[in-house]
């Protein structure tokens, strides 16, 4: 049995199950999971997994899928999957808030993993769509904010609002060479209270298309701030 997701285990997106002869795979990233696109391989006749024969063996597909979902239910029942609070503000060291540590809401916003240190929050394009990080702030104070993102030249111009129980910090989205080429943009400073808090990144004013591809947010406590 195998399932892989950088956020919450999902029985439909990236999974596989095998026995001594058969291997059934479901692999979906940005596309909607579709049982007609599951892949079945005969490991004895085709150890290289070159020929998908799911359509020829529907009974094996049903058997293996049931075995997988039974196992998935057993190992996930009673478990809570959510990001832990990120420690911020220790000895003035900068902290990077990665996309995979956030939760997100909105009709278009999406998390994409294209490689280590190459994951993004993307797809968002309407006012109110947001990503949220849980923080554990060691010291209250003002924190410098640096955004790491890409934005296609024709899509720039929207406004990202950062907030954490304080005066919001607005950043006008700037263009990069392409949406896949990230740059760092100082966004100003924000007040963070000590203890548990949330940092929200919200579309305040939408641009003409995809808002940005956010690759990370860097926070660094400013000297002598309280």
Each PLM stretch: what is its role?
Residues 1-39, 43:
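C-terminal cap/loop subdomain of S1 sulfatases and analogous C-terminal strand-loop tails that border
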Residues 43, 51-54:
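Helix-turn-helix-type domain boundary/helix-start signal
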Residues 48, 52, 61-226:
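Extracytoplasmic
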């Amino acid at each position: 049995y195998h399932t892989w997701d950088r956020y919450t285990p999902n029985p439909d997106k990236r999974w596989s199950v095998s026995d001594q002869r058969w291997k059934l795979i479901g692999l979906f990233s940005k596309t909607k999971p579709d049982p007609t696109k599951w892949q079945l391989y005969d490991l004895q006749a085709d150890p290289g997994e070159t020929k998908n024969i799911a359509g020829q063996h529907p009974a094996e597909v049903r058997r293996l899928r049931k075995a997988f979902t039974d196992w998935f239910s057993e190992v996930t029942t009673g478990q809570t999957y959510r990001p832990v609070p990120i420690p911020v503000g220790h000895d003035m060291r900068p902290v990077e808030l990665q996309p995979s540590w956030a939760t997100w809401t909105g009709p278009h916003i999406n998390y994409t993993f294209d490689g280590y240190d190459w994951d993004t929050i993307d797809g968002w394009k309407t006012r109110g769509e947001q990503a949220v990080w849980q923080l554990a702030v060691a010291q209250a104070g003002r924190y410098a904010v640096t955004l790491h993102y890409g934005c296609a030249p024709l899509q720039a111009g929207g406004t990202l609002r950062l907030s954490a129980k304080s005066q919001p910090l607005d950043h006008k989205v700037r263009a990069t060479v392409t949406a896949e080429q990230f740059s760092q943009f100082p966004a100003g400073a924000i007040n963070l209270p000590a203890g548990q808090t949330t940092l929200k990144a919200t579309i305040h004013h939408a641009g003409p298309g995809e808002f940005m591809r956010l690759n990370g947010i860097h926070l660094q406590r400013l000297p002598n701030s309280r």
